[in-house]
Amino acid sequence: MSNTMREASNVFEYQKEYISPLCDDMDVEYQIIDKDRYATYDICGPDPESPLPGYFTEYNGRDKNGLCAGKQPTFCSDKWKKEVVQRYLNGRCGEDELTKRGVEMWMGISVEETRRVRLTGGKWNRRYPLVDMMITKTMAIQFVEDYGLPTPPASLCWMCPNRDDDLWLYMKNNVPEDFKKACEHEKEIQMEWPWLWLTKYGVPLAEAPLTPSGGKHAQMDLVQFCDSGMCFV
């Protein structure tokens, strides 16, 4: 698992308490790879005017409802996850050896996220077991709970602009230290890019009119996630 250095703190707490011991019981090696050891970019990417995360932007104005009219393309999953995992494996196993035999990368993308599937061949071959088995996110969570484990938290960065209102509210109410970091992060990025925001509302996160969906977004608003297919490796 790639640690983007901004992963929601309750995710790693869950991984440490439940997933790591489970892997030990199954004799499966479990690794968390720090992004900063292998990534070539952090927030600022190759284009200094376009940071890697898909922040909302008012650069071209706002719509009739006063919301940000645009959203940045998302490259953070490629730079912080895909390339980090690949460089780690090349260094550990040998680039030539991996090129010769190929690597299967299992992606934790559920069947309702099929549009994010990217079929690949060659050295890095992506597999989508949940899609192949027609497993939805709700079903996957139920499997975990039926095994006797607590409901797993959503895995995404605390500053990820792809969070819907429900996820922002969950973090604000249940992981307030992460919400505070996200508010500070928004202020930091606006020192460099004052037209960017973490939410579509285009106001400081602490003041955003976040509204619960009442269960409407129980599957998360999958449409707004990036197309790279790399958020869940």
PLM regions and their residue ranges:
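Nucleotide-activated chemistry modules centered on ATP-dependent adenylation/adenylyltransferase
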Residues: M1-V233
